[in-house]
Amino acid sequence: MSSSSPGEPLEPTDQDLDVLLKNLGNLVTPMALRVAATLRLVDHLLAGADTLAGLADRTDTHPQALSRLVRHLTVVGVLEGGEKQGRPLRPTRLGMLLADGHPAQQRAWLDLNGAVSHADLAFTGLLDVVRTGRPAYAGRYGRPFWEDLSADVALADSFDALMSCDEDLAYEAPADAYDWSAVRHVLDVGGGNGGMLAAIALRAPHLRGTLVELAGPAERARRRFADAGLADRVTVAEGDFFKPLPVTADVVLLSFVLLNWSDEDALTILRGCVRALEPGGRLLVLDRADVEGDGADRFFSTLLDLRMLTFMGGRVRTRDEVVDLAGSAGLALASERTSGSTTLPFDFSILEFTAVSEEAAPAAQASEALPAQE
């Protein structure tokens, strides 16, 4: 048994080596899982294709290559049985997580044709990301993440489905956490498919809303508002939030926007929002913003942070970092509240800011240049 002095690293054990080889340093299994998810292997097995020949026929794959994939999935505990065992091939309890109908939605998250797993392939460029600080997504796919989603309907639809797979967690709980009774007009900046603004408008039938987004998500938001019967109160403006915003409002909302951007870009976004505030207005920032920076689970916190860095050059910030960034844009924290959700794998809150000076928030001048919507 090895010994070491206090403060010195311990000698790794054979068990440590096993963990490194099989879990931490292994790229084969993560890709095998993604291929299984993309081919919907578990769903085909559940539908009766319980032999390799039947599975290859259903998935239009090379039988021998598929058999080697299945063998590895069996070794790692995703599948069990097979012809050599004299039993039908079937998913294990773990493998059932890859069924399309499972509420954890892991098949969709791992599907290589879906937005997140597609983007995860950019992690092959993580070395360059760490060396340069620049995201890898555009280098792999030819255009930045958000531009790609705006232009590719299939990717965008998969992204929207993943982000709103639990409407209660994604939109309803945060919408319930704030008092909208005195709000006249909400300007949702970078509001995606409109899920958050729709949840707010349905809870506050007196207010009007405007969503600013790129062309692709803007069109999806229009459909959502129309389907929800909100088209008479909620409008969509196609635009780039790095440019002047199209209207002013008494509440400007940034919902999970800032973590997608570098400090420099996030500051530009915040300053644009300040200019769109009407006198006495409030900026609401719904974001990952916990006190310590570790979230409810450090694994998900650091995983999300590296994804933000690799996909689009963003970063997950602590609550204090968000407050400091807002302060640089001329904002002061007025209040904060939890989102109303206790089940997300990382902490987030609603931070409410007000402009601290006329210089930082020239609302009177802005309201002359931008049409206010009552």
Swiss-Prot record:
Changing R307A: Abolishes hydroxylation of 10-carboxy-13-deoxycarminomycin. Changing C165S: Approximately equally active as the native enzyme. The record marks N260 as: Required for 4-O-methylation activity. GO terms for biological process: antibiotic biosynthetic process. Its EC number is 4.1.1.-, 2.1.1.-. Pathway: Antibiotic biosynthesis; rhodomycin biosynthesis; Antibiotic biosynthesis; aclacinomycin biosynthesis. This is Aclacinomycin 10-hydroxylase RdmB. It comes from Streptomyces purpurascens. The lineage of its organism: Bacteria, Bacillati, Actinomycetota, Actinomycetes, Kitasatosporales.
